[in-house]
Amino acid sequence: MRQDQKKVEVVFSPEMYRHFENHQANVVIVDILRATSAICTAFMNGVSQVIPVPTLEEAQSYKQKGYMVAAERDGRVMDFADFGNSPFNFTKERIQGKQVAYSTTNGTRAVHMARNSKMVVIASFLNLTAVYDLLSKKDEDVLIMCAGWKGKFSLEDTLFSGALVEKLLAGGGFYTICDSI
């Protein structure tokens, strides 16, 4: 570890976040199968804004204000929602130029938990290089939070976290004290 290096850590479940929480760190949210991949897809398809909201009540209030809403719980699309949380729902024809409020079982909850961090970054395999480039230019430590499934470990989120950590460590600007990385 050099003086100019930044620390990178991985939180394998939101349930463990309180043990790692660091308001001066940049927190990377990872929910590979749904939330973060869907948000990346939405921006690739021209959405003007995605607002991650932790509760269904909040999502419904955005619906009443005229926003499109993508919302699910336990994999079921909510009755009031325009569509669910699959990246395949975020097509250019559906969302280009629109504002979307987005609420999911796991991913948007993780975003909400990290809201007081220095910066919250949404990451998936779709934007891995862009996330690496962004974090490499920042001076803060990085905490990668796997959204998991209902507070439990998620293999796909962990796989992505490993890929990002590998890039960060190989770039030379980061170190880790964690023996599981």
Task: Place the predicted regions along the sequence by residue.
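A short glycine-rich beta-strand->turn/loop micro-motif centered on a GG-aromatic cluster
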Residues: 52-56
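Short, structured patches in soluble enzyme cores that scaffold and shape functional sites
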Residues: 104-105, 124, 146-148
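Structural motif
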Residues: 8-9, 25-28, 48-51, 66-70, ...
